[in-house]
């Protein structure tokens, strides 16, 4: 299974802002497009880690079934 997410970059007076359309909270900025791209990769990882931590806290002690999902890089 492949899941494709969309990165959006916009030129602003300070450089670039970027976000992922399908992943709320994954947004960043950079002085250059390359910096914004790199920062967005880090932001994606941080959002996923934070969501995992929140989920683990919410289901702690609950009877749940966890199944892994593998997303292929585009």
What is the predicted role of each segment?
Residues 1-6, 34, 38-74:
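Short, charged, surface-exposed hinge/linker loops at domain edges
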Residues 8-21:
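Short aromatic-glycine-(Arg/Gly/Cys) micro-motifs in beta-strand/loop hairpins
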Residues 24-33:
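A short, exposed loop/beta-hairpin motif centered on an aromatic-Gly-Thr core
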């Amino acid at each position: 299974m492949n899941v494709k997410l969309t990165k959006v970059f916009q030129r602003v007076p300070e450089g670039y802002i970027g976000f992922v359309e399908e992943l709320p909270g994954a947004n960043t900025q950079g002085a250059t497009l390359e910096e914004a791209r790199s920062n967005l990769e880090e932001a994606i990882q941080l959002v996923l880690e934070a969501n995992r931590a929140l989920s683990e806290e919410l289901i702690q002690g609950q009877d749940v079934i966890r199944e892994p999902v593998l997303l292929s890089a585009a």
